[in-house]
């Protein structure tokens, strides 16, 4: 899938995802159920991957 965003849109989306990431870390820390924590950690890894790719794309866009 291709999605074209302006730099400002990328910054907004990254900020929203970073906030969710911080919330997710807190949620993981307060979760006692092993399987649920495992699921949250999987979501955290996916979110980190998305943020990383979003940032890379933003840097490439600035260089262009």
Predicted segments with their positions:
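Terminal, compositionally biased segments
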Residues: 1, 63-64
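N-terminal acidic leader/helix
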Residues: 1-27
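Short, charge-rich amphipathic interface segments used for partner binding and complex assembly
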Residues: 30, 34-61
